[in-house]
Protein backbone atom coordinates (compact mmCIF):
# COMPACT_ATOMS: atom_id res chain seq x y z
CA UNK A 1 0.00 0.00 0.00
CA UNK A 2 1.47 3.35 -1.08
CA UNK A 3 1.78 6.45 1.08
CA UNK A 4 -1.30 8.09 -0.45
CA UNK A 5 -3.39 4.95 0.00
CA UNK A 6 -2.31 4.67 3.65
CA UNK A 7 -3.28 8.29 4.24
CA UNK A 8 -6.73 7.72 2.74
CA UNK A 9 -7.26 4.59 4.84
CA UNK A 10 -6.17 6.41 8.00
CA UNK A 11 -8.55 9.26 7.29
CA UNK A 12 -11.40 6.85 6.55
CA UNK A 13 -10.91 5.15 9.90
CA UNK A 14 -10.57 8.50 11.65
CA UNK A 15 -13.86 9.67 10.16
CA UNK A 16 -15.57 6.45 11.22
CA UNK A 17 -14.29 6.81 14.78
CA UNK A 18 -15.36 10.45 14.91
CA UNK A 19 -18.79 9.58 13.60
CA UNK A 20 -19.22 6.88 16.22
CA UNK A 21 -17.99 9.17 18.96
CA UNK A 22 -20.35 11.98 18.06
CA UNK A 23 -23.33 10.05 19.37
CA UNK A 24 -22.06 10.13 22.95
CA UNK A 25 -20.47 13.58 22.89
CA UNK A 26 -21.75 16.68 24.62
CA UNK A 27 -22.82 17.98 21.21
CA UNK A 28 -25.82 15.69 21.39
CA UNK A 29 -27.21 17.64 24.33
CA UNK A 30 -27.98 20.54 21.99
CA UNK A 31 -28.11 18.76 18.64
CA UNK A 32 -30.90 16.19 18.54
CA UNK A 33 -31.29 16.58 14.79
CA UNK A 34 -30.91 12.92 13.86
CA UNK A 35 -33.38 11.72 16.49
CA UNK A 36 -35.84 14.49 15.67
CA UNK A 37 -35.96 13.41 12.05
CA UNK A 38 -36.93 9.80 12.74
CA UNK A 39 -40.57 9.18 11.99
CA UNK A 40 -41.26 12.55 10.37
CA UNK A 41 -42.86 12.15 6.98
CA UNK A 42 -40.83 14.79 5.14
CA UNK A 43 -37.51 13.65 6.54
CA UNK A 44 -37.11 9.94 5.96
CA UNK A 45 -33.39 10.07 5.41
CA UNK A 46 -31.22 10.84 2.39
CA UNK A 47 -32.93 10.70 -0.98
CA UNK A 48 -31.53 9.52 -4.31
CA UNK A 49 -32.53 12.78 -5.98
CA UNK A 50 -30.39 15.22 -4.03
CA UNK A 51 -27.36 16.39 -6.01
CA UNK A 52 -24.42 17.76 -4.06
CA UNK A 53 -23.63 21.26 -5.38
CA UNK A 54 -19.89 20.64 -5.32
CA UNK A 55 -17.17 18.06 -5.93
CA UNK A 56 -15.68 16.13 -3.04
CA UNK A 57 -12.13 17.21 -3.93
CA UNK A 58 -12.97 20.94 -3.89
CA UNK A 59 -11.32 23.66 -1.84
CA UNK A 60 -14.20 24.98 0.26
CA UNK A 61 -14.66 28.36 1.92
CA UNK A 62 -17.62 28.33 4.31
CA UNK A 63 -18.99 31.66 5.48
CA UNK A 64 -21.26 32.70 8.33
CA UNK A 65 -20.95 29.47 10.30
CA UNK A 66 -22.81 29.49 13.61
CA UNK A 67 -21.92 26.47 15.72
CA UNK A 68 -19.85 24.98 12.85
CA UNK A 69 -21.99 21.83 12.73
CA UNK A 70 -22.55 22.14 8.97
CA UNK A 71 -18.82 22.51 8.33
CA UNK A 72 -18.10 19.43 10.42
CA UNK A 73 -20.78 17.34 8.70
CA UNK A 74 -19.62 18.44 5.25
CA UNK A 75 -16.03 17.56 6.05
CA UNK A 76 -16.93 14.26 7.66
CA UNK A 77 -19.16 12.91 4.91
CA UNK A 78 -18.47 14.69 1.63
CA UNK A 79 -14.86 15.84 1.37
CA UNK A 80 -12.10 13.57 0.10
CA UNK A 81 -8.46 13.59 1.18
CA UNK A 82 -7.72 15.83 -1.81
CA UNK A 83 -10.28 18.39 -0.65
CA UNK A 84 -9.92 21.17 1.90
CA UNK A 85 -12.34 23.06 4.14
CA UNK A 86 -11.83 26.53 5.61
CA UNK A 87 -14.84 27.31 7.81
CA UNK A 88 -15.35 30.87 9.04
CA UNK A 89 -17.59 32.84 11.35
CA UNK A 90 -18.50 36.51 11.38
CA UNK A 91 -18.39 36.43 15.18
CA UNK A 92 -15.23 36.78 17.21
CA UNK A 93 -13.97 33.74 19.07
CA UNK A 94 -15.24 35.12 22.37
CA UNK A 95 -18.68 36.03 21.00
CA UNK A 96 -18.93 32.59 19.46
CA UNK A 97 -18.40 30.92 22.83
CA UNK A 98 -21.28 32.90 24.31
CA UNK A 99 -23.68 32.53 21.41
CA UNK A 100 -23.01 28.90 20.50
CA UNK A 101 -21.77 26.81 23.47
CA UNK A 102 -21.47 23.69 21.30
CA UNK A 103 -19.24 25.36 18.71
CA UNK A 104 -15.96 24.58 20.49
CA UNK A 105 -16.40 20.84 20.14
CA UNK A 106 -17.33 21.05 16.47
CA UNK A 107 -14.34 23.30 15.80
CA UNK A 108 -12.04 20.84 17.54
CA UNK A 109 -13.31 17.98 15.40
CA UNK A 110 -12.99 20.04 12.22
CA UNK A 111 -9.35 20.77 12.99
CA UNK A 112 -8.61 17.17 14.00
CA UNK A 113 -10.06 16.06 10.68
CA UNK A 114 -7.86 18.36 8.61
CA UNK A 115 -10.03 21.47 8.27
CA UNK A 116 -9.24 25.00 9.36
CA UNK A 117 -11.30 27.63 11.18
CA UNK A 118 -11.14 31.42 11.16
CA UNK A 119 -13.17 34.04 13.03
CA UNK A 120 -14.23 37.64 12.38
CA UNK A 121 -14.52 37.11 8.63
CA UNK A 122 -16.79 39.64 6.91
CA UNK A 123 -18.28 38.07 3.78
CA UNK A 124 -18.58 41.49 2.15
CA UNK A 125 -14.85 42.21 2.52
CA UNK A 126 -13.22 38.91 1.61
CA UNK A 127 -11.00 40.55 -1.00
CA UNK A 128 -9.48 42.82 1.66
CA UNK A 129 -8.54 40.13 4.19
CA UNK A 130 -4.78 39.62 4.09
CA UNK A 131 -4.98 35.86 4.71
CA UNK A 132 -7.80 35.23 2.25
CA UNK A 133 -7.18 37.54 -0.69
CA UNK A 134 -4.29 35.42 -1.97
CA UNK A 135 -6.25 32.14 -1.81
CA UNK A 136 -8.52 30.51 -4.38
CA UNK A 137 -11.53 28.33 -3.65
CA UNK A 138 -13.62 26.02 -5.82
CA UNK A 139 -16.75 26.37 -3.68
CA UNK A 140 -17.73 29.36 -1.57
CA UNK A 141 -20.63 28.21 0.58
CA UNK A 142 -22.96 30.48 2.58
CA UNK A 143 -25.94 28.86 4.26
CA UNK A 144 -28.87 31.06 5.27
CA UNK A 145 -27.11 34.44 5.08
CA UNK A 146 -28.66 37.26 7.10
CA UNK A 147 -27.39 40.64 8.21
CA UNK A 148 -28.78 39.98 11.70
CA UNK A 149 -29.55 43.62 12.43
CA UNK A 150 -33.07 42.98 13.69
CA UNK A 151 -34.67 45.54 11.37
CA UNK A 152 -38.43 45.31 11.94
CA UNK A 153 -39.56 47.06 8.78
CA UNK A 154 -39.66 44.36 6.10
CA UNK A 155 -38.76 46.60 3.16
CA UNK A 156 -35.74 48.04 4.97
CA UNK A 157 -34.75 44.57 6.14
CA UNK A 158 -34.88 43.24 2.58
CA UNK A 159 -32.83 46.17 1.28
CA UNK A 160 -30.20 45.72 3.99
CA UNK A 161 -29.74 42.04 3.14
CA UNK A 162 -29.65 42.79 -0.58
CA UNK A 163 -26.84 45.29 -0.04
CA UNK A 164 -24.95 42.70 1.99
CA UNK A 165 -25.32 40.00 -0.66
CA UNK A 166 -24.39 42.29 -3.54
CA UNK A 167 -21.20 43.28 -1.71
CA UNK A 168 -20.51 39.60 -1.04
CA UNK A 169 -20.86 38.66 -4.71
CA UNK A 170 -18.44 41.39 -5.72
CA UNK A 171 -15.88 40.49 -3.05
CA UNK A 172 -16.04 36.75 -3.80
CA UNK A 173 -14.86 37.13 -7.40
CA UNK A 174 -11.32 37.65 -6.19
CA UNK A 175 -11.30 34.32 -4.33
CA UNK A 176 -12.91 32.01 -6.89
CA UNK A 177 -10.79 29.51 -8.79
CA UNK A 178 -11.27 28.95 -12.53
CA UNK A 179 -13.87 26.31 -11.72
CA UNK A 180 -15.26 28.28 -8.78
CA UNK A 181 -18.93 28.14 -7.79
CA UNK A 182 -20.80 30.20 -5.21
CA UNK A 183 -23.48 28.29 -3.29
CA UNK A 184 -26.04 30.21 -1.25
CA UNK A 185 -28.77 28.40 0.67
CA UNK A 186 -32.02 30.22 1.42
CA UNK A 187 -35.37 29.20 2.88
CA UNK A 188 -38.17 29.11 0.33
CA UNK A 189 -40.35 31.48 2.34
CA UNK A 190 -40.80 35.22 2.68
CA UNK A 191 -38.90 37.47 3.14
CA UNK A 192 -36.05 35.43 1.59
CA UNK A 193 -37.95 34.87 -1.65
CA UNK A 194 -38.22 38.66 -1.96
CA UNK A 195 -34.47 39.22 -1.90
CA UNK A 196 -34.14 38.72 -5.68
CA UNK A 197 -30.98 36.70 -5.22
CA UNK A 198 -30.56 35.86 -8.92
CA UNK A 199 -30.97 39.51 -9.85
CA UNK A 200 -28.29 40.53 -7.35
CA UNK A 201 -25.92 37.90 -8.74
CA UNK A 202 -26.57 39.10 -12.29
CA UNK A 203 -25.83 42.70 -11.31
CA UNK A 204 -22.49 41.55 -9.87
CA UNK A 205 -21.48 39.68 -13.04
CA UNK A 206 -22.64 36.14 -12.29
CA UNK A 207 -24.74 33.57 -14.10
CA UNK A 208 -27.07 31.10 -12.41
CA UNK A 209 -25.55 27.62 -12.75
CA UNK A 210 -28.34 25.61 -11.11
CA UNK A 211 -30.61 25.38 -8.12
CA UNK A 212 -31.10 22.32 -5.96
CA UNK A 213 -33.51 21.63 -3.13
CA UNK A 214 -31.52 21.40 0.10
CA UNK A 215 -31.68 18.02 1.83
CA UNK A 216 -30.34 18.37 5.37
CA UNK A 217 -30.37 14.60 5.90
CA UNK A 218 -27.13 14.46 3.89
CA UNK A 219 -25.54 16.48 6.71
CA UNK A 220 -26.72 14.54 9.79
CA UNK A 221 -24.66 16.50 12.32
CA UNK A 222 -25.96 19.84 11.07
CA UNK A 223 -28.23 21.90 13.30
CA UNK A 224 -29.04 25.42 12.15
CA UNK A 225 -28.46 28.25 14.61
CA UNK A 226 -30.11 31.66 14.50
CA UNK A 227 -27.89 34.72 14.14
CA UNK A 228 -28.79 35.72 17.72
CA UNK A 229 -27.28 32.48 18.98
CA UNK A 230 -28.34 29.78 21.42
CA UNK A 231 -30.44 30.98 24.38
CA UNK A 232 -30.46 28.68 27.40
CA UNK A 233 -33.93 27.85 28.64
CA UNK A 234 -35.52 28.89 25.36
CA UNK A 235 -33.70 27.38 22.39
CA UNK A 236 -33.78 23.81 23.67
CA UNK A 237 -37.57 23.98 24.10
CA UNK A 238 -38.22 25.50 20.72
CA UNK A 239 -39.71 23.15 18.10
CA UNK A 240 -38.17 25.32 15.36
CA UNK A 241 -35.57 23.49 13.28
CA UNK A 242 -34.06 25.83 10.72
CA UNK A 243 -32.33 23.04 8.84
CA UNK A 244 -35.68 21.30 8.25
CA UNK A 245 -37.31 24.23 6.46
CA UNK A 246 -38.00 23.97 2.76
CA UNK A 247 -34.79 25.48 1.44
CA UNK A 248 -32.81 25.63 -1.77
CA UNK A 249 -29.20 25.89 -2.91
CA UNK A 250 -28.60 28.64 -5.47
CA UNK A 251 -25.38 28.12 -7.42
CA UNK A 252 -23.65 30.87 -9.39
CA UNK A 253 -20.58 31.16 -11.60
CA UNK A 254 -18.79 34.17 -13.04
CA UNK A 255 -20.07 35.22 -16.47
CA UNK A 256 -18.34 33.29 -19.24
CA UNK A 257 -17.64 30.21 -17.14
CA UNK A 258 -17.94 26.86 -18.95
CA UNK A 259 -18.71 24.86 -15.82
CA UNK A 260 -21.43 22.28 -16.35
CA UNK A 261 -24.26 22.14 -13.78
CA UNK A 262 -23.78 19.29 -11.33
CA UNK A 263 -27.33 18.05 -11.87
CA UNK A 264 -26.76 17.67 -15.63
CA UNK A 265 -23.61 15.60 -15.54
CA UNK A 266 -23.63 12.06 -16.91
CA UNK A 267 -22.48 10.41 -13.71
CA UNK A 268 -25.49 10.64 -11.42
CA UNK A 269 -24.67 10.63 -7.75
CA UNK A 270 -26.00 7.61 -5.92
CA UNK A 271 -26.42 7.13 -2.21
CA UNK A 272 -23.53 4.63 -2.15
CA UNK A 273 -21.18 7.26 -3.56
CA UNK A 274 -21.84 9.48 -0.56
CA UNK A 275 -20.74 6.99 2.09
CA UNK A 276 -17.61 7.55 4.13
CA UNK A 277 -15.88 4.54 2.60
CA UNK A 278 -16.42 5.55 -1.01
CA UNK A 279 -15.41 9.17 -0.42
CA UNK A 280 -12.01 8.01 0.76
CA UNK A 281 -11.33 5.09 -1.53
CA UNK A 282 -11.76 6.73 -4.92
From Swiss-Prot:
Its main location: nucleus. It comes from the Eukaryota. One of its GO terms (cellular component) is nucleolus. GO terms for biological process: rRNA base methylation. It is an enzyme of class 2 (transferase). It catalyses: uridine in 25S rRNA + S-adenosyl-L-methionine = N(3)-methyluridine in 25S rRNA + S-adenosyl-L-homocysteine + H(+). Coiled coil: none annotated. Residues 18-35 have a biased composition (Polar residues). It is found in: Nucleus, Nucleolus. This is 25S rRNA (uridine-N(3))-methyltransferase. It comes from Schizosaccharomyces pombe (strain 972 / ATCC 24843) (Fission yeast).
Amino acid sequence: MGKKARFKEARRLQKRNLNNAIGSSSINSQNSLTNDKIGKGKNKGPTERYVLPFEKNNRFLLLGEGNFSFAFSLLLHHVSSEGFVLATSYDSKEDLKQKYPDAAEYISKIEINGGKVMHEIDATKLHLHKKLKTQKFDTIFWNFPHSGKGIKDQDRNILDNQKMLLAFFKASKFLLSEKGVIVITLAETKPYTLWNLKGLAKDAGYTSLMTEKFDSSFYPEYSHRRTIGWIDGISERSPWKGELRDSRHYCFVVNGSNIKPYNQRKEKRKRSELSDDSSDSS
